[in-house]
């Protein structure tokens, strides 16, 4: 699929950028905030430029939406069937301390009235991780596939064409520093039950990393309701 080829090209370029550039420089703040209210770093801008440049050349993409831009971008392909939305570098706040980062994306199909009705319009979504390896997970055509980049041949290799989450794990993931804001006693009891059953807690603030850990190890992920909470990333990749 042409869209996937453009995404893969972007993933490799962002991975190379992270690996080959001074991470302190990449972590420098730019004097602006993005659409989610986050501070913007140099790596955010550069990653967004990579994604936008590659995807705007794809004849299947009509519109591009990025967390780093306030407005949607219309490509020259005005009759193309798809809108793509992405966070070009989830976890950029950790770039200068060498913690795994990622790209989150979702592709929507316009209906007969040239509208995106709701989440049911999603035809493909996933995320790419930039860490010890460059890997991406793709939800498409009623299955989830897992790929890893091979620098030796310059291609992404399929590792698992039917990725499934474990039915039960032994880890739960949430930010317990927000405990005083929890208002539902049932949620507090749920966490106490996890502790009694000797679950281990893990928490990383970035969705792409959390989602990868949850899928691989069968974690329970909890996102408590917060007025300042970043629900955008999680909603995007569902």
Question: Where are the predicted features?
Answer:
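Short, basic, glycine/proline-bearing loop/turn elements
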Residues: 34-39, 59, 102-107, 111, ...
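Catalytic-loop motifs flanking and including active-site residues across diverse enzymes
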Residues: 47, 99-100, 207
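DPxDG-like acidic metal-binding loop motif
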Residues: 80-143
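N-terminal glycine-rich anion-binding loops that anchor highly charged ligand groups
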Residues: 16-28
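Buried hydrophobic packing segments
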Residues: 51, 55, 103-107, 211
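N-terminal assembly/interaction segments in proteins that build large macromolecular machines
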Residues: 27-84
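An extended, acidic
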Residues: 4-7, 11-14, 18, 33, ...
């Amino acid at each position: 699929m042409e869209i996937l080829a453009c995404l893969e090209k972007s993933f490799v370029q962002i991975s190379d950028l992270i690996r080959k550039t001074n991470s302190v420089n990449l972590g420098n703040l730019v004097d602006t905030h993005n659409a989610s209210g986050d501070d913007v770093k140099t790596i955010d801008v550069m990653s967004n430029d990579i994604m936008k440049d590659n995807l705007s050349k794809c004849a299947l993409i009509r519109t591009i939406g990025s967390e780093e831009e306030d407005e949607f971008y219309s490509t020259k392909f005005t009759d193309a069937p798809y809108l793509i939305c992405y966070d070009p570098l989830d976890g950029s706040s950790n770039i200068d301390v060498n913690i795994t980062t990622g790209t989150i994306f979702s592709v929507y199909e316009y209906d007969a009235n040239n509208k995106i009705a709701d989440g049911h319009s999603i035809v493909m979504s996933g995320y790419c991780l930039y860490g010890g390896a460059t890997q991406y997970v793709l939800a498409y055509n009623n299955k989830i596939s897992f790929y890893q980049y091979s620098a030796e041949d310059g291609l992404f290799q399929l590792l698992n064409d039917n990725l499934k989450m474990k039915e039960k794990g032994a880890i739960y993931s949430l930010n317990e520093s927000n405990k005083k804001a929890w208002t539902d006693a049932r949620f507090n009891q749920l966490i106490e039950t996890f502790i009694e059953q000797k679950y281990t807690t893990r928490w990383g603030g970035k969705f792409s990393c959390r989602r990868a850990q949850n899928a691989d190890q069968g974690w329970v992920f909890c996102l408590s309701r917060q007025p300042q909470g970043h629900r955008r990333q999680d909603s995007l990749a569902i």
